[in-house]
A protein has these predicted regions:
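Vicinal oxygen chelate
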Residues: 2-38, 69-74, 83-96, 100, ...
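Short, structured motif recognition centered on aromatic/hydrophobic residues
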Residues: 39-47, 92, 122-126, 223-227, ...
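Short, amphipathic alpha-helical interface elements at domain boundaries
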Residues: 78-80
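Short, low-complexity Pro/Thr/Gly
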Residues: 101-102, 123
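Short, structured patches in soluble enzyme cores that scaffold and shape functional sites
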Residues: 180, 230-232
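Long, well-ordered mid-to-C-terminal structural blocks that present hydrophobic/aromatic surfaces
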Residues: 249-307, 312-317
Length: 384
């Protein structure tokens, strides 16, 4: 049996007594129930974009990450493009509605927020997790009051039918899915007709050719972490909810005082490398927006949530640790991609002495998501 409570904790943030009590109880019960051992790492990440944007986003990801276009699943309401690195890292399922007027629960989440509503179909939906016995996992989770879409609802939402999917979280608005697969089998999604879309393949090839020409292909590694922004009051319950749905454990939290926020990290209790199952990070303000005027505190995280809704903010791609002529790989990657017209927010921060160097891109024109590049030095596993 996996013991999720015996793994080391890091960070400097103090949590409430409520959180510490229920964290221990939740993980102990999850371990004893067998759920921790039945649920594995992240199999796939689901992203939705506006009609007409998926092909250009494939080209963007082909340049900025190790992902490559594999196939397209052509179903009644969507084109779902499967992007893959290999079977040792999660897939990306990139969904594009065929009809700009298409409406579902995910669009309704965007419609609630002033900036999110401008791109009603563009959002990160959530993760699909590997599991050993999907029906048993769902049964146990339903007993613990987690709610799932019925098969008929999945068909109406035009989602893979071999995946059980939770209702969107009230705290993060993300979903969690479970997919059963023998570890030596490839991932297969029971969804639509499997085709190779010529324009998607051409976009991928264009991005990969540029990546090769710029000399950055060998510097880019799989996803390091996925960062979701949430309201300040939902920090602890969002963590508990994700730990209840997954086999992750609470790695720890750091206060980011100058930003009036905290970075809260969960990782695989099976101690899988992040390249196999990325860390899940939750960022929240330390104080709600309604009192910021009293202390004149910054509020970038809460402002984002108020504009877009609780949702994934960025996907962090790891950059291999190394230098060329005294320059870190991350600086070479950023210079090369910036030279192709991609914007970045501020400069890289951190250093080899601090253990980490990172930078954020501007939001994608095609998905609204940000790519973070992170280069860790030596065995440093922390966060800024």
């Amino acid at each position: 049996m996996t013991y999720s409570t015996r793994l080391p904790r890091y960070g400097d943030k103090t949590n409430s007594a409520f959180f510490e009590e229920y964290l221990q109880r939740l993980l102990e019960e999850r371990d004893k129930s067998g759920l921790t051992d039945m649920i594995g790492g992240i199999e796939a990440m689901l992203i939705s974009v506006e009609p007409g944007n998926s092909v250009e986003y494939i080209a963007e990801l082909a340049l900025m990450s190790p992902y490559e276009y594999l196939v397209t699943l052509d179903s009644e309401k969507h084109l779902t493009h499967v992007l893959r690195i290999d079977m040792n890292s999660p897939d990306i399922l990139l969904r594009e509605p065929k009809d700009v007027k298409h409406s579902d629960i995910f669009r309704s989440l965007n419609d609630l927020y002033p900036v999110g509503s401008r791109r009603p179909h563009s959002r990160y939906l959530g993760e699909i997790l590997h599991c050993k016995d999907r029906h048993q996992v769902v049964s146990l989770q339903q007993q613990r009051e987690f709610r799932f879409f019925q098969v008929g609802q999945l068909a109406e939402l035009d989602l893979p039918l071999n995946v059980s999917i939770s209702k969107p979280s009230p705290y993060t608005q993300n979903i969690v899915g479970y997919m059963e697969r023998q570890t030596d089998n490839i991932r297969v999604y029971q969804h639509g007709n499997c085709i190779i879309l010529p324009q998607a393949q051409a976009a991928n090839d264009r991005g990969k050719e540029m990546q090769e020409r710029l000399g950055i292909k060998d510097f880019l590694c799989p996803v390091d972490h996925l960062a979701t922004r949430i309201y300040s009051q939902n920090r602890e319950v969002a963590l508990l909810e994700y730990l209840g749905l997954s086999s992750y454990y609470y790695w720890g939290s750091y206060d980011i005082t100058d930003q009036n926020s905290s970075t809260n990290v969960t990782k695989s209790a099976h101690e899988l490398q992040e390249s196999r199952s990325p860390a899940k990070v939750f960022t929240a303000n330390n104080h709600p927006y309604c009192v910021n005027h009293l202390d004149q505190l910054p509020s970038p995280t809460e402002n984002f949530v108020r504009n877009y809704g609780p949702r994934l903010h960025h996907i962090a791609v790891e950059v291999k640790d190394g230098q060329v002529n005294g320059r870190e790989y991350i600086d070479l990657v950023v210079d090369a991609i910036a030279g192709q017209g991609k914007g970045f927010l501020l400069e890289t921060i951190g250093s080899r002495n601090e253990g980490l160097k990172q930078i954020f891109s501007s939001a994608s024109d095609f998905s609204s998501l940000i790519i973070e590049y992170v280069q860790r030095f030596g065995d440093f596993q922390g966060f800024f």
